[in-house]
Regions:
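N-terminal binding-site loop/beta-alpha segment at the start of enzyme catalytic domains
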Residues: 1-93
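Acidic (Asp/Glu)-rich catalytic clusters
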Residues: 8-10, 49, 76-93, 125-129, ...
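Conserved, mostly hydrophobic/aromatic
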Residues: 16, 40, 47, 55, ...
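Active-site mouth loops of central-metabolism enzymes
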Residues: 20-38, 103-118, 139-145
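Beta/alpha (TIM)-barrel catalytic core signal, keyed to glycine-rich beta->alpha loops juxtaposed to Asp/Glu
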Residues: 23, 31, 141-216
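Short, acidic/polar
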Residues: 32-48, 111-128, 173-181
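A structural motif
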Residues: 52, 130-133, 163, 191
Length: 216
């Protein structure tokens, strides 16, 4: 399978987005994930058998507000039960995200504070069963905290060793350039990824893709 550099690691160019196992929108409502669990782990195993080495998750991917982290637990179990060798498992990169909040009554919000980032990253590492996250990405910006402070908080997770690498999600082109200015390029040990929606139907972030190609 074609490989792609992601910071200091080579991963498959095709990854598996695991959100649907725990949560998927259907006319504004979340579908029952239990209906998918029976076939979900074998499906992940099939992808890993085919050479996929990138799994995407997030702390917020969960059936309900009081089960945050559901998807991370699932991903950890899928990798744990895979028949691959230790060497093969070590090549798998799990990318998770944080920064969106869900509280009682399905109240959604965002929190870009350092205290929240630290707690979120530690909780994700616990659920994934690792001492250090492969890749932690800032899910969405908090409108109540200035941009520079938020991205500096992202870099703290790497500086303190909670995450091997850090990235962002749902940043526009100008925000991405500012993040690179603050944290540096992948070759400088800074930002290594951005996860935005992009497809033949949604091409509004083409300029973001061009920035990624420029900075590697």
């Amino acid at each position: 399978m074609k490989q792609q550099r992601l910071g200091n690691k080579e991963v498959s160019a095709i990854g598996i987005g695991c959100m649907n196992v725990s949560w998927i929108w259907s006319n504004g409502a979340a579908l029952d994930p239990v209906q998918r669990l029976e076939s979900a782990i074998p499906a992940i195993h099939a992808g890993l058998d085919a050479g996929i080495t990138l799994l995407d998750t997030a702390d917020i991917y969960a059936p309900t507000w009081d089960d945050v982290g559901h998807n991370e637990v699932f991903v950890a179990e899928a990798l744990r039960t895979w028949s691959g060798t230790k060497e093969q498992k070590d090549k798998v990169l799990i990318a998770t995200k944080g920064g969106i909040t869900r509280s009682e009554g399905e109240v959604w919000g965002r929190n870009g504070s350092l205290d929240y980032f630290l707690r979120a990253a530690e909780a994700s590492a616990f659920r994934l069963g690792v001492e250090q996250l492969d890749l932690w990405q800032h899910h969405r910006l908090d409108p109540n905290i200035n941009f520079e402070t938020q991205f500096e908080n992202v870099m703290v997770l790497k500086d303190r060793g909670l995450a091997k690498q850090v990235g962002v999600s749902n940043y526009d082109a100008q925000q991405l350039l500012k993040a690179i200015e603050i944290g540096g390029t992948p070759d400088q040990g800074g930002l290594v990824s951005i996860q935005n929606e992009f497809s033949p139907r949604y091409r509004h972030d083409l300029n973001v893709l061009e920035i990624c190609e420029e900075y590697g």
